[in-house]
Swiss-Prot record:
HAMAP family: Leu_Phe_trans (MF_00688). Belongs to the L/F-transferase family. This is Leucyl/phenylalanyl-tRNA--protein transferase. The lineage of its organism: Bacteria, Pseudomonadati, Pseudomonadota, Betaproteobacteria, Burkholderiales. Its EC number is 2.3.2.6. GO terms for biological process: protein catabolic process.
Length: 250
């Protein structure tokens, strides 16, 4: 059994989440409350929401937890070549928070292999939109010739980033945004990006699973640090991966 949370209820301890032999490993609690306050309380404890339309809000704390250290991003030869083009070509732009809600909607509507529908419901978009307006959620976007072709979004608390979803409408466009995010976060002393659940795709990008207890301890320490401000991106931060100077602006 899992806990049902009324709006005033705290989360149960994360070690009470369902175990690996259950039908839903990592499931901790359920509620109808998806307020920004509930979301912030969840993230600071290593908990995230994931549910389908028509279900109550389901809260998870998986063990192990998939994380990506920004310096560990695995840049393939093809992606490295793409990043060099991005740096040299003024047709390519990396924008931060150009249109956060548009990125969320693109993540919700972009078809994915093996996935029917989306967990990014209207309620999710509204709740994370509020976090964004309060400076606690951000998007990183790949633009080509004035068109948004890829991007990602997540929650930023202190020196911790919780990745939520990404999309690509052009080859490697989401990976370009991820490389930009890793470069930006690395420059600001962020040691870990939360990737939530273990998948082969995330592993191919350099993410790795760590014990939940280790993850939660890191989250508590990192979210207590000062927040990154402002969120501004310059192409030159990608030079650490691509090794090619960015073209001058103008």
């Amino acid at each position: 059994m899992i806990a049902w949370l009324d709006p005033q209820d705290p989360f149960p301890p994360v070690d009470e989440a369902l175990g690996p032999d259950s039908e839903a490993p990592g499931l901790l609690a359920a509620s109808r409350d998806l307020s920004p306050q509930r979301l912030l309380l969840a993230y600071r404890q290593g908990i995230f929401p994931w549910y389908s339309s028509g279900q109550p809000v389901l809260w998870w704390s998986t063990d192990p937890r998939m994380v990506l250290a920004p310096p560990a991003l695995r840049v393939s030869l093809n992606l490295r070549k793409t990043l060099r083009r991005v740096l040299r070509d003024a047709d390519w732009e990396i924008r931060v928070d150009d249109d956060f809600l548009a990125v969320m909607r693109a993540c919700a509507t972009t078809p994915r292999d093996g996935q029917d529908g989306t967990w990014i419901t209207d309620d999710i978009i509204a709740a994370y939109g509020t976090l964004h307006r309060n400076g606690m959620a951000h998007s990183v976007e790949s633009w080509y010739r004035g068109e948004r072709v890829g991007g990602l979004y997540g929650v930023a608390l202190g020196r911790m980033f919780f990745g939520e979803s990404m999309f690509a409408h052009r080859t490697d466009a989401s990976k370009i945004a991820l490389a930009a995010l890793c470069a930006f976060l690395g420059n600001h002393g962020v040691a870990m990006i939360d990737c939530q659940q273990e998948t082969d795709h995330l592993a191919s990008l350099g993410a790795r699973p760590i014990p939940r207890a280790e993850f939660v301890a890191h989250v508590r320490a990192a979210t207590a640090l000062p927040a990154i401000s402002p969120w501004r991106f310059d192409k030159s931060v990608l030079e650490r991966w691509a090794g090619t100077p960015a073209a001058p602006a103008g």
